[in-house]
């Protein structure tokens, strides 16, 4: 690390990411990260889409046979893109790095299941998801308190109960995605909400980057 960068970190009194040091604005970094993730995902998807495993059809999904032959495992592309951008735009703290690794681990679990000639056993997939959820819960509680703040109220939840709630939330969320035909059933609405929120919160910054080459 250069003396200038080190001095900047010392003056700020807090951890900063590389892009924030270059731009000086967290809002600019957030807007840039959003655009980078979108552009990188679109580019990588167009390049590697044909190399993804093919859907074999789904026996219990509505119109599952119509999915036969479609590309599967696209999470390998967009999760890795998101992970790279995340490491570039968030402070390099151990907590955030662990979350990123767990995100990739969860994605790889689904990808290898998609790529397998024989679908994995439900108990195997559920156990992997459970381990990921437990590690995520322990990581969060190791770096954060068990206090919950709501408006003017604040109260603490016992560690064991808080851990159970985190594990249930993460484990259930992973399996809700599995029950909605992969990410297809959730991505559209989440993308619309996320994009709309970014446009409202960072309209000026996004506009500046979008028109920078004009």
Where are these regions (language model features)?
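Short, strongly hydrophobic alpha-helical membrane anchors
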Residues: 3-6, 10-28
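"…together with the soluble PPM/PP2C metallo-phosphatase catalytic core" -> "…together
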Residues: 19-214
């Amino acid at each position: 690390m250069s003396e200038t960068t080190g001095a900047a970190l010392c003056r700020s009194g807090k951890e900063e990411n590389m892009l924030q040091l270059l731009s000086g604005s967290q809002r600019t970094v957030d807007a840039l990260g959003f655009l980078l993730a979108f552009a990188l995902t679109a580019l990588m998807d167009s390049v590697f889409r044909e190399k993804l495993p093919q859907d074999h059809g789904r026996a219990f999904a509505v119109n599952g046979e119509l999915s036969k032959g479609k590309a599967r495992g696209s999470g390998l592309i967009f999760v890795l893109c998101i992970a790279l951008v995340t490491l570039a735009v968030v402070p390099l703290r151990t907590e955030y790095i662990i979350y990123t690794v767990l995100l990739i681990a969860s994605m790889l679990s689904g990808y290898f299941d998609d790529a397998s000639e024989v679908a994995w056993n439900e108990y195997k997939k559920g156990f992997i998801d459970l381990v990921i959820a437990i590690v995520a819960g322990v990581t969060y509680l190791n770096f954060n308190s068990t206090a919950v703040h709501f408006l003017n109220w604040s109260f603490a939840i016992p560690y064991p109960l808080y851990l159970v709630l985190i594990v249930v939330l993460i484990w259930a969320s992973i399996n809700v995605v599995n029950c909605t035909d992969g990410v297809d059933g959730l991505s559209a609405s989440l993308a619309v909400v996320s994009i709309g929120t970014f446009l409202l919160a960072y309209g000026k910054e996004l506009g500046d980057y979008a028109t920078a080459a004009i």
